[in-house]
Amino acid sequence: MHRSLAGSAVLMLLLLFALGNFVGVQPGLVTRDADNGQLMDNRRNLRLERKTMSLFKSLDKRADCSTYCFGMGICQSGCYCGPGHACMPNGR
């Protein structure tokens, strides 16, 4: 492999790790059951805990919540129906 290709590959890997969304295996989360010797996964449901990461604010965080819901609970994404039937931004 040429030096320029190797440098590009290393740079791409560094960017992948720096900007990626990784869930690692932490020690102590996978254990062996004392009764039957089976491996057990002690991690909580990762799908529920996963938070998306982005370099830029997503559109729903910039949503304009200046509309009224009239008690029907219908607001834009990123908003909720608050007091006075006004859509309010979620506390993110």
Swiss-Prot record:
Residues 1-20 form the signal peptide. Disulfide bonds join C65-C79, C69-C81, C75-C87. The keyword 4Fe-4S does not apply. The modification Asparagine amide is found at N90. Residues 21-62 form a propeptide. It is found in: Secreted. GO terms for cellular component: extracellular region. It comes from the Eukaryota. Keywords: Amidation, Disulfide bond, Ion channel impairing toxin, Neurotoxin, Secreted, Signal, Toxin. Expressed by the venom duct. Its main location: secreted. One of its GO terms (molecular function) is ion channel regulator activity. Coiled coil: none annotated. Belongs to the conotoxin P superfamily. The cysteine framework is IX (C-C-C-C-C-C). Probable neurotoxin that inhibits ion channels. This is Conotoxin Im9.4. It comes from Conus imperialis (Imperial cone).
